[in-house]
Amino acid sequence: MKKLVITLSLIAVAALAFACKSGSAPAIGKVIKSGPAGNNLTVSLATSDGVLKHGNTEFTLSFTDVGGKPVDVGAVALTFHMPQMGTMQAMNDPATFTTTETPGVYRGKASIQMAGESQAKITYEGPAGRGETSFPVTVQ
């Protein structure tokens, strides 16, 4: 009887763990900004502490459908663009990405030259189609 209870308990725990993993949104950190990305998708930019810092920085870019589930969009690109101000040249700081275990969630790195207001310009092309968007972000 004791073995039966232990076996059933282990099966229940395994089933619960599988159910939680398959339907949950990805753990991406604290979202800095999100917005529509075309093709009924939402893109979210997040960092571990919710702050985008200048210099070498790491972040997560995730694409989700209307139900909040991650969607693989294929190749992604992001550039942090700060327009020309006075004698200062415009800055375009590109990011590099690696995929994660979760399709639609990408780990990014960038070297952002200066703190201030920038535009995050995002493009993608792949299984979900082609799309682009941009939104303002504050770099600290």
PLM feature spans:
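Intrinsically disordered, low-complexity terminal tails/loops enriched in metal-binding residues
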Residues: 19-140
